[in-house]
Amino acid sequence: MRNIKLTIEYDGTSYFGWQKQPIGNTIQQKVEEAIKKVTKEEVEILGSSRTDSGVHAKAYVANFKTNSNIPGKNFKAALNSKLPKDIVIINSEEVAEDFHARYMTTGKTYCYTILNREEPPALERNYVYHVKKQLDVESMKEACKYFLGKHDFKAFQRPGGTVKTSVRTITDIHIETEGNKIKIYVSADGFLYNMVRLIVGTLLKVGRGKEKPEYIKEVIDSGDRKKAGICVPPTGLCLEKVFY
């Protein structure tokens, strides 16, 4: 069988995340339905991660096996003609038979966007997290350095994960500002359940002046979820890139 790799952009607002589930609408379900319409085959598409309800993606990676003779690059147009407008295939290609979108990843980059102004957003309400009080961005940037490297991120994991270890390596974490938007980029070899959202919630405690930057090290060393910040909403989170 042939192995087709897809790079997918999607708006997660209307979906219950990536992974197919009986209770509702998911990205995986929609993509599999589109593949069936194109190939007349029942397939199971393998995704690079399980993004939660409301989370978006610029370059999600998935793959599926098929007996179809459609050229790999042509799946992009074929599937886009069958998909809803909030899910778009931005690239399709045939890859080695042993390629696996999830198990072969070496890392991912996420971005979380905060809108830091008094007025709540109207147009971007599904893509940012609104914080009314002015944040101390410089202190947040200073705090980021404590996340870098290999640590046990047990304090940054919500109940519900099934991983064997909570040790992860954050290879890059930095903050960029665009007007009243604060963008927090986090790259790691892997992520725990809600890890990015908890990192952002903890950085907000620093940004609001409730804690000093060194507080981040205390939370990591404690391994105590209760010491970390809130789990911010999914709306501001976007999967930027998957590495292989």
UniProtKB/Swiss-Prot annotation:
A Pfam family hit: PseudoU_synth_1
Gene Ontology BP terms: tRNA pseudouridine synthesis
GO molecular function: RNA binding; tRNA pseudouridine(38-40) synthase activity
Sites where the protein binds substrate: Y110
Catalytic machinery residues: D52 (nucleophile)
Reactions that this protein is recorded to catalyse: uridine(38/39/40) in tRNA = pseudouridine(38/39/40) in tRNA
Keywords: Isomerase, tRNA processing
EC number: 5.4.99.12
HAMAP family: TruA
Family: Belongs to the tRNA pseudouridine synthase TruA family.
Assembly with partners or alone: Homodimer.
Protein name: tRNA pseudouridine synthase A 2
Source species of the chain: Clostridium perfringens (strain 13 / Type A)
